[in-house]
Amino acid sequence: MEVREIPLPAATKLAADYITGAFPAESGFAYAQADDEAFCRRLAYLQGRTYDREGLADYLRAYHRRFSASVATMANIEKLRNERSVVIVGGQQAGLLTGPLYTIYKIITIIQLAKEQERKLGVPVVPLFWIAGEDHDIAEIDHVYVVEEGEVKKAAYPHKTNEKRMAADVLLDRMAAKEWIERVVKTYGETDVTNELLFFLSSCLDEARTFVDFFAAIVLRLFADHGLVVLNAGDAAVRPLERRFFAALIERHRDVTAAVLAQQEALRTLGYAPLIEIGRDAANLFYYDGRERSLLQYDEERGLFHNKAGTLVWTREELLELAETNPARLSNNVVTRPLMQEHLLPTLAFVAGPGEIAYWAELKEAFPLFDLEMPPVVPRLQATIVSRSLQTDLSDIGLEVADVLTGRLDEAKREWREATAQAPLASAFAKAKADIDAAHRPLRELGVAIDRGLEGLVAKNAAILQAQIEFLQHALERALLRKHETEWRKFWRIETSLRPNGALQERVWNVFYYINRYGFDFVEKLLAIRSPGNGMHKIVYM
């Protein structure tokens, strides 16, 4: 395995500028850089604060026992009782089979950074993955992408399409899930690893009742030796730990909204468009009745909290009572989730994708409202996997991986198509069209001379003749492409692997395609990638 680096700008302008150092970091973040000096300062800050470490460790120990978590994971949970311990945290939705590769890359970054900082700082550093089990948009996590019939297709797990419960509560039908897994893995092709892979996923499914369970079971096994800890943000059992902070969020909801709106305006003046959609009436919490999440708003005039439809209404006192007596009825939104994370966890650093980097900058002024400080924000690993056969294809057509990732492939395809299928026919068909037009012109003139009312008819007849010639030209072009199909399929393989549906590989393909091809030590190989946190895109040649 060989790893090279290329500069590849992030999709969001703010994240791209933050990674390269062009963004004025003090305008969006508490730490200008996520470097050793920042981690030392952050550690000193954390050691001046208190957390409910016993409650957190007790909850996590009980949760992980459900999944027969590894000795390393259980040991890391116990480390959290140590007043000096800290965590490296990052999170994502609970995608089926872990979703796109970027989720795995985020976990890898968390683990790498935790090991590095534990060695440098001399304190226990726990790698923790925050599973966004509160999310209710199941359509975002119910599928993976596969190649079928020569096309990149979405393979969705069959479930109720109008599902509105949190992912943590959406049950999996074991037989339907097993059949779906087999269908997905079949598209990967049979290898020496396939049976082991199917057994692995079946074993994870045995431990799972819900989408989140399945995700947790998979990542806890994949990273068992590295002591990964997970936190299911949609678990009702974690809500008692959040009760006090829910009350604080209710008390200061107007201040939170005002802080975000003001920060968004400040970023606009710097040329950065905001990502978070938030109105002045936002309460930044959801109410959850076990079936559906309702985003809460605040009616300033009446002094009442309510859902959008106005069918659920609370006074401030009633909502505070709910937070105290039944906190499982509340959950966080995009604004309050990072704040809750900081309340619960002694976070040394937050590992973020490009979108998260951009929207966290919008939250800068919300943290101080609760005497919190935004942690250092570390960009996750960004990578593209290149197989040996794909390296040959790239060499044959004269392209580098960087060319493909920066959009050069479409131009190369067009040039090849023109040279291979269009150029050899172009002059012959241009002459044929001109000759037919010349032969037809006297007939058009004769028709119009006989009856001017025939002008439209003769013009249409001429167009039909030209269209038939173009039809024949396209048919011959397709025949030439078939003749050169071996060469054409190189373009298809490159595009499908590196730029599927025009997106980055890490945003489409799933880790188990690569495990099926390279074995379970594929994940260990990724963990061995030295990731200096310089924001460069890693090209991993297998």
UniProtKB/Swiss-Prot annotation:
Keywords: Coiled coil, Ligase. The keyword Membrane does not apply. It comes from the Bacteria. Its EC number is 6.-.-.-. It is an enzyme of class 6 (ligase). GO terms for molecular function: ligase activity. Residues 458-487 form a coiled coil. It holds the Pfam family CC_BshC. InterPro entries: Bacillithiol_biosynth_BshC, CC_BshC, Rossmann-like_BshC. Involved in bacillithiol (BSH) biosynthesis. May catalyze the last step of the pathway, the addition of cysteine to glucosamine malate (GlcN-Mal) to generate BSH. Belongs to the BshC family. This is Putative cysteine ligase BshC. It comes from Geobacillus kaustophilus (strain HTA426). The gene is bshC.
